[in-house]
Amino acid sequence: MNPSFFLTVLCLGVASAAPKLDPNLDAHWHQWKATHRRLYGMNEEEWRRAVWEKNKKIIDLHNQEYSEGKHGFRMAMNAFGDMTNEEFRQVMNGFQNQKHKKGKLFHEPLLVDVPKSVDWTKKGYVTPVKNQGQCGSCWAFSATGALEGQMFRKTGKLVSLSEQNLVDCSRAQGNQGCNGGLMDNAFQYIKDNGCLDSEESYPYLATDTNSCNYKPECSAANDTGFVDIPQREKALMKAVATVGPISVAIDAGHTSFQFYKSGIYYDPDCSSKDLDHGVLVVGYGFEGTDSNNNKFWIVKNSWGPEWGWNGYVKMAKDQNNHCGIATAASYPTV
């Protein structure tokens, strides 16, 4: 991403005068820069520092309110600390919403008693948390996660699959590499192509290469199509319980999500329709002793293990389809 673009956007959102910086935060700022290996030009650093300080104040205020019982989740400074929320949404969130579903419709099992909690990470279905970098390829990570789970269900072997294969090769199905895409389009590419390479044979580069380097001899998975789940949390719950990890899209464009750390994520401003980020539901559960309260979805993100709850987020469950978690859910068939 061009640093000059970031600076231009930033300058539009901050007063033209030099920002007033808090000298008491000097040590924290230098430690954050060292941790995240940030190097700036002379003209950019104070603007980045101003954004970082603004984000830190938002985080500190939220956590103070959390300690007073006003929120159910904590926030923390992370690698996105020097990014405005506008930059964050442009760079990290690459899901492109679609109005018309193309897959088979999920038929909810009628005679199945679904458990009150499920966690597929404990059953061997889920690979370690990955990092999409500054590339809007969240859709590819969501798609590989769902297919990794279904292939494990079929073969008993967990193999990390290639997101770069999807980024480079699925444009004919409607995806746009680092500029966004859809999980269903990824599943369609895998069906059309006949297979998908492993992560080991086709490693992730976090960029558009403008060439497809798929190797048939390195094929590690395939699918026969995909299934779209009705836009209801009960249907999603049954799918997660009976099928495995499910690809979903959410509204992840809020500062509260950008700096989420732990607890059950709930933001009243979160939309159930304006979706911008593909993730993977790997289970669900509840906190405390009452299974009817404090319910959450276990969601695997693709921003590295340092973000959130070891790379995961607990998202509020049965709260009117909060953040649209059931709006665009699907999984591949194998």
UniProtKB/Swiss-Prot annotation:
Lineage top rank: taxon: Eukaryota
Main location: other
UniProt keyword Glycoprotein present: yes
Active site: C138, H277, N301
Residues spanning the signal sequence: 1-17
Enzyme class: hydrolase
Protein's cellular compartments: Lysosome
Positions of the propeptide removed during maturation: 18-113
One Pfam family, short name: Inhibitor_I29
Glycan-carrying positions: N222
Reactions listed under catalytic activity: The recombinant enzyme hydrolyzes proteins (serum albumin, collagen) and synthetic substrates (Z-Phe-Arg-NHMec > Z-Leu-Arg-NHMec > Z-Val-Arg-NHMec)
A Gene Ontology biological process term: proteolysis involved in protein catabolic process
Disulfide bonds: C135-C178, C169-C212, C270-C323
EC number: 3.4.22.43
Similarity section: Belongs to the peptidase C1 family.
Role noted for this protein: Cysteine protease. May have an important role in corneal physiology.
Protein's UniProt name: Cathepsin L2
Upper lineage: Eukaryota, Metazoa, Chordata, Craniata, Vertebrata
Gene: CTSV
